[in-house]
Amino acid sequence: MLKIKFVGAIEGVSGSCTWLHHTDSDTQFLVDCGMHQGTEREEWANSQAFPFQAARLKYVLLTHAHIDHCGMLPRLVREGFTGLVYATRATRELTELMLLDAARVSGMFTEQEVKQIRWSVLDDDLGFKWGRSIRLAEGVWMAYLRSSHILGACLISIGWKVHDGNRSICFSGDVGCQTDENAYLPLMKSGQHPFPDTDYIVVESTYGSRIRAQEHQDSQLRLARLAEVIAHTLFVKGGKVLMPAFSLHRAQELLMDVLHWMKVSLPAIRQAPEHRGSDRLITANVHAPLGHAVTQVYAKHLCSISPNGKFKYLNAELCESLTMQADEIQAMLQRLVEHGRFNAGEGGYLSMTKPKQPSNFEADIVIASAGMCGNGPVVSYLERWGSNPRNTVILTGYQSAGSKGAELMQRATASPALMDSLSPDLAEVVDMSPYYSAHADQQMLLGFLFRTDGFGCNKPATILINHGNPASKYELRKAVQMRADSRKENDRQIKEVRIADARWINLDSGEVIEQSPIEQALLNELEALRRRL
């Protein structure tokens, strides 16, 4: 029997961790082991005892490098885990960077505990390909498929033998936005889908209740809006542009979009007589200490090639957009990391501030961490530029309640305003975050669940929804049921849609494993205590 218990991301969007136990081989393992983030109540969960014995786990299968999916790995090691963490090479390198940074910032674990993690890197094998089966134990195997969420991200399929054949379950990880039809964000190629004969699909629901506007899924409109805001700030108002950014993935996306502005938009802008001073050299700087190291990983792996000769991760449309070959993009990123400067042509140049170097207030455009504006280099730029209406802050990511970024978001507009309508002692704020979200919306999640890529074998699948707030989960469940009832041609058939909870499930039969009265009473007491705290 293979049984499953959801440990984290049951009530919210962080702390992803799922415990599986194959009883026939007595093999216990996890899919992800993430840190809870957000409110004090949510972060309180990080100090609570694991429901499993870390020393008895043989593996952790890691979907990607975000802290809410990998952040408790060092604690797992501290408590006796000596097994292997499976991941792609890019995910391993990014995870190590994220955990070392978290060790320095949070103090929840040590750098030594991060370095003690034992890795098994899937794509170091010369025979690696997406979807290839890898044995975990007698009668249990897994396969990794590509996600478009961030570099190295994957969905994971786990298969096992039962008395009448085989069963399988797929874990979505975080579902990205890129599809075969519309890979509109700059870096990642489209993600793959669960196998057509999958029996169970565990799917995230971060934006399960949200439908993104078509405008925000259009790369040309995103680039045009960014060009409008930058040109208005630099050449009409005569100010500076500040773009707060998360160090992992968002900073690298913005770097590509700013490079596009320099290479493609700026030459056209210079033909317009109303843009005074547009013939001067423009400088754009990336100032993110962790982002500097992350960019080095992107330089190594973004343009890597699979054994079939195709890009493993790179969105090929980026080459066309920038009029650069993949090796030129790779060389540009490497040059920024090593030498701190890249000539973007006649328009100007990109630069990257190395860790511990001072802020570059001379730059015209600055991409700075942290994304929510509460710490990091962005703080010094806000202090210097935040009181001048000639300057513009472009928000490109989620801002949690109570953060400095959320405060800025309260007065943000969707497009630049006339100078005389702005506050005389505050920088203008423009919200472009809907254009950059790396999470699939409801329609994309439905596509992820129902698409079978034309393959005929299509078992009815049970959907298990987690990693979302209650409203998102219930709205997604309703949408999945409605789509299933419509019986579209070539859609995956759906057997049942459930909201994931903390009870054990026998995946051989699909039945919930009921607790004994004593166990259930103890669980009820713990839940009541947790809610009071």
Predicted segments with their positions:
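C-terminal accessory regions
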Residues: 445, 452-459, 476
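Short, surface-exposed amphipathic charged segments that create phosphate/polyanion-binding patches used
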Residues: 140-144, 297-306, 444-448, 508-521
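Conserved acidic residues
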Residues: 58, 199, 364, 391, ...
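Hard-cation-handling environments
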Residues: 226-239, 244-407, 412, 416-419, ...
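Generic long, charged, amphipathic alpha-helical segments
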Residues: 408, 416-449
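Heptad-repeat coiled-coil amphipathic alpha-helices that mediate oligomerization/assembly
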Residues: 519-533
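Conserved phosphate-binding/catalytic loops in two-lobed NTP-binding clefts
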Residues: 485-507
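His/Asp/Glu-rich metal-coordinating catalytic cores
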Residues: 1-61, 66, 70, 75-236, ...
